[in-house]
Structure formats: C-alpha cells, structure tokens
Design a protein with these regions (language model features):
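Active-site rim helix/loop that mediates acceptor-substrate recognition in acyltransferases
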Residues: 2-35, 40
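Conserved acyl-donor/pantetheine-binding loop and adjacent beta-alpha core of acyl/acetyltransferases
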Residues: 25, 39, 43-80, 122-132
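Short beta-strand micro-motifs in enzyme catalytic cores
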Residues: 34-36, 72-74, 152-158
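Short, well-ordered beta-strand micro-motif
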Residues: 37-39, 49, 157-161
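Conserved acetyl-CoA-binding loop-helix of GNAT-fold acetyltransferases
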Residues: 78-81, 87-104
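Conserved GNAT acetyl-CoA-binding A-motif
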Residues: 95, 102-126
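C-terminal "cap" of GNAT-fold acetyltransferases
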Residues: 125-138, 144-165
Length: 165
C-alpha cells in the first residue's frame, strides 16, 4: 500500500488502515490484479506488486523517483518473501512472473526501483524493492541514480523493454 498512497497520506495511516486498504484493493478483483502471489504447498510464500506506473500514487507525485520519459511503463515496486523461502531464488521467480504478467497485459516497458547491495547484504526492511543484481540478471539497465540523503542504501531506477526473449 506504501506505493499506492501519497507520502502525506501514508504518514497518517496506521497498520489497521493499511491492512484494510490492502484487503479492499485485493477484494476488488481488478484486472490487471495489483500483484502476484507465489505458493508452496498451498501456502502463500511470496508477493510481487506490479502494475502500470500511473497506478502508484507515490510514483506519480515523486520528486525522488522521477518519471524518466513518456513511455507507458509498468512498475515493479515491491517483493515480500517469507523468511523460510529467502535465499532460494524466489524473488527472481516472482520477477519473471511479474514481467510475463505485465507483457500479457500490454506493457511496453518495465521499470523498478531496486537497491544496490554492492558487495554487502541489505536488511529485508531496506531491500523490499528488490536488489539491483536480480534486475540486471533479468535484463534491466540502470537509467537513473536516486539521490536521497535519508536513504541508507544506494537506490536506482532500472528499465527494460517489455518484450521477453
């Protein structure tokens, strides 16, 4: 929900309101859906949020993550992977599924906002947008360096054409 709310609206939201908003969003049975779930043995173990960039209020109004050009891109804004599944490649599988889903729904370009871990590890609380290395392995290229003094990690904007090889 973070990406679907303006900064000032997020600052006033409490956990219950965010959870309720998320449930309302999912219950709308939207097409396209607001994201994709990964299941193992009938249990949800991962999530990726993917939608047209304009669906994300925070991006529409962002000075930190500016609109690069007029290409109508789909944005991949966050991943959630259960602790038991981390380190097993699920984020890459979710990314592949998100790219395919966006293409199926007419995306011409894909955009994301990962962190660059460099040689180190990134805490899950900071790496929820994905790691640069994961996106680079999927054919994305850095198109913008995000300069944010309050960020504890290097963040970038990456893009790739939507056509999948």
């Amino acid at each position: 929900m973070f990406w679907r709310l303006r900064s000032k609206d997020w600052s006033y939201a409490n956990t219950a309101a965010v959870r309720e908003g998320f449930h309302r969003l999912v219950d709308q049975d939207l097409d396209p859906a607001p994201g994709l779930l990964a299941y193992r043995d009938g249990r949800a173990v991962g999530w990726v949020s993917v939608a047209p960039r304009d669906d994300y209020e925070r991006l529409t109004n962002s000075r930190v993550r500016p609109k690069i050009d007029d290409t109508p891109v789909w944005s991949i804004v966050c991943f959630v992977v259960s602790k038991a599944e981390r380190g097993q490649g699920l984020t890459s599988k979710l990314l592949d599924a998100a790219m395919a889903y966006a293409v199926e729904h007419g995306a011409r370009g894909l955009e994301a906002y990962p962190v660059d871990a460099g040689d180190g590890r990134v805490p899950a609380a900071l790496g929820y947008t994905g790691l640069l290395s994961t996106f680079e392995a999927a054919g994305f290229e850095v198109v913008h360096q995000i300069d944010s003094p309050q960020s504890k990690v290097r963040r970038v904007i990456v893009r790739r054409a939507a056509a999948l090889e």
